Amino acid sequence: MDEKQLYKHIITKSTNTCVKFTPRDITKITDYVYLGNYRNVIELPNKTFFKYIVNVSMLKYKLKRTDITVLHFPLEDNDTVSISKHIDAVTYVLKKCESLKIPVLVHCMAGINRSSAMIMGYLMEIRDKNIPFVIYFLYIYHELKYIRGAFIENKSFLNQIIDKYI
């Protein structure tokens, strides 16, 4: 077993945990990047600080309000879809928003698989390279799973992220 296979095995075994509850609230990921679900978008108050919403669900919608721009990256939640190009595109947007200090909310329908995978990809991309990948990955995964109750339950998405960044 080589190092990459060993890391993948450790991460796969360490992330095989049960869902404790489904996420309801928006979670602050960084100073300007947030993770949520479709319901969070529908229930946004009239005064919100989000300037961009990244929608990675299949549902295309327009907000009645004009103070928020919705960017749609349609992504199915199944075991056969490739998420790599979506991670790259969403990471580009999130890096740009972060650098310009523009608040952005990333969501899918439930805020569990698609949007969580995009967030994990973003965090892997911007991580401190002095911290070993496997340690950082497990830290982020378990922290967000603890906060949100469910986080990247689609094992195909999880494996694709591992393969992309190991």
From Swiss-Prot:
Any one Pfam family match given in the protein's UniProt record, by short name: DSPc
GO cellular component, one term: host cell cytoplasm
Active-site residues per Swiss-Prot or TrEMBL entry: 108
UniProt domain Tyrosine-protein phosphatase: residue ranges: 25-166
Alphabetized CDD domains for the sequence: DSP
Reactions catalysed, as given in the entry: O-phospho-L-tyrosyl-[protein] + H2O = L-tyrosyl-[protein] + phosphate; O-phospho-L-seryl-[protein] + H2O = L-seryl-[protein] + phosphate
Localisation: Virion; Host cytoplasm
Top EC class for this record: hydrolase
Alphabetical list of InterPro entries matching this protein: Dual-sp_phosphatase_cat-dom, Dual_spec_Phospatases, Prot-tyrosine_phosphatase-like, Tyr_Pase_AS, Tyr_Pase_cat, Tyr_Pase_dom, TYR_PHOSPHATASE_DUAL_dom
BP GO terms, sorted: symbiont-mediated suppression of host innate immune response; symbiont-mediated suppression of host JAK-STAT cascade via inhibition of STAT1 activity; symbiont-mediated suppression of host type I interferon-mediated signaling pathway
Keyword terms, alphabetized: Host cytoplasm, Host-virus interaction, Hydrolase, Inhibition of host innate immune response by virus, Inhibition of host interferon signaling pathway by virus, Inhibition of host STAT1 by virus, Interferon antiviral system evasion, Late protein, Protein phosphatase, Viral immunoevasion, Virion
Assigned EC number: 3.1.3.-, 3.1.3.48
Gene Ontology MF term list: protein serine/threonine phosphatase activity; protein tyrosine phosphatase activity
Induction trigger: Expressed in the late phase of the viral replicative cycle.
Assigned protein family: Belongs to the protein-tyrosine phosphatase family. Non-receptor class dual specificity subfamily.
Subunit composition and interactions: Homodimer.
Entry function: Serine/Tyrosine phosphatase which down-regulates cellular antiviral response by dephosphorylating activated STAT1 and blocking interferon (IFN)-stimulated innate immune responses.
The name this protein goes by in its record: Probable dual specificity protein phosphatase H1 homolog
